[in-house]
Amino acid sequence: DSCKVPHFYTNKEKELCELENPLIFMSVSDIPNVRKIQEILEYAIKSNRSMLLIAPLESQPLTALAMNKAKGNIKVNVIDPPSFGLKRKDILEDLALLVGATVFDESLGDSIDAITPDMLGSADKAVSDKDGTVLVVSEKSKEVQDRIEYLKTTLAKEDHAVMTKHLTDRIALLSG
């Protein structure tokens, strides 16, 4: 998805947010306040790394992050997870595999109080504008290659137009 808050732009003229070597947190569950992600934010600051949050954040954590970015405490960007429902979960799982993250999901029993740095992934670069976000990952794991092959096999058997499009989009996302 696209950059949510202009305060996160690193290039205001081009309306871009570029993060080099960001840590990446992903969630399908709402993050109600900044305390719930405080441990991973502190980890990013101590590690001198930027942070990309692909998560539905409520207004309090968004405001707190914008203030901390404005003060120069952390380089951060927040984008909404792409798509909806099961498609959202599929796409986030694919992205997580690509960047080495764990998707936070309360519906699967994850505790909002147990968001830790070991859930974070990383990319070489993340660039967001008003139209979307591109993650640059130079090294693709064997698991990513296996997922691409699995999706291609599934696609070859699929005849429903909506599912064909969804599978094609997922293959494109993982293939870069």
Across the structure, where does each feature detected by a protein language model lie?
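Long, structured protein-protein interaction/assembly regions in large complexes
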Residues: D1-G176
